[in-house]
Amino acid sequence: MLITPNTTHEPRTPAIAEAIEEALEQRMLLTHPFYRRWEAGELQLGELDSYARNYRSFEAALPVVLSAVVQRLNTDGSAEVANRVQRNLDDELGRPESHLALFDRFAAAVSPPGSATEAAEAGPAADALVATYTDLVEEGPVAALSALAAYETQASAIAASKAEGLRRWYGIDGAGAAFWDVHAAMDADHGDWAIDALASLDADPAVVRVAAKRAADAWWTFLDECEAAAPVGASCAG
């Protein structure tokens, strides 16, 4: 994937984008066997249900991550960048409504009637994914924003692919696909915000690369766990 950054504001943006791209080598999520099977309609509903139960833990943690980054940036005197992150937090909490609420409708669409996705216990890789982001937040805004950029730069394409797969293969539309529709449109509009924020902080591309790689590896391991639970004979080879 070639990340084409917005270069109108910060001269360091291309170097940051290149660092993110290098971190994502062999870790572009749409190439993972689990997402390839989603695109091809080869996932069973039970796999989508399990995925939703695990992914929810990250979606629930994301506002906490963003809030912590905003607080740290304000403490460090980086109010302009803090405002940029705050806008994304505001989107997460209420544009067009809480994204967690939108996600729960997706989860309900792929889960057995009467199941409570929000009460489900996440698996080890999902817990590790959240822990990775939490650890990077504690390291500081550059590390946290690098982790966010590792996902945000590919989020629009991932969301669009998921929404298309849900409609085409599983007959899930409307409320069931809205979470992915919102992210496909919203992230296409400003998916490079984290790269711009890193450039505004004059982040060291080497530091960005290391933190983004940690996040990318955690996402890949999460999908490995999803794929490992596939029924015998269902997993994608290669």
Positions of PLM-derived features:
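Non-heme di-metal
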Residues: 2-238
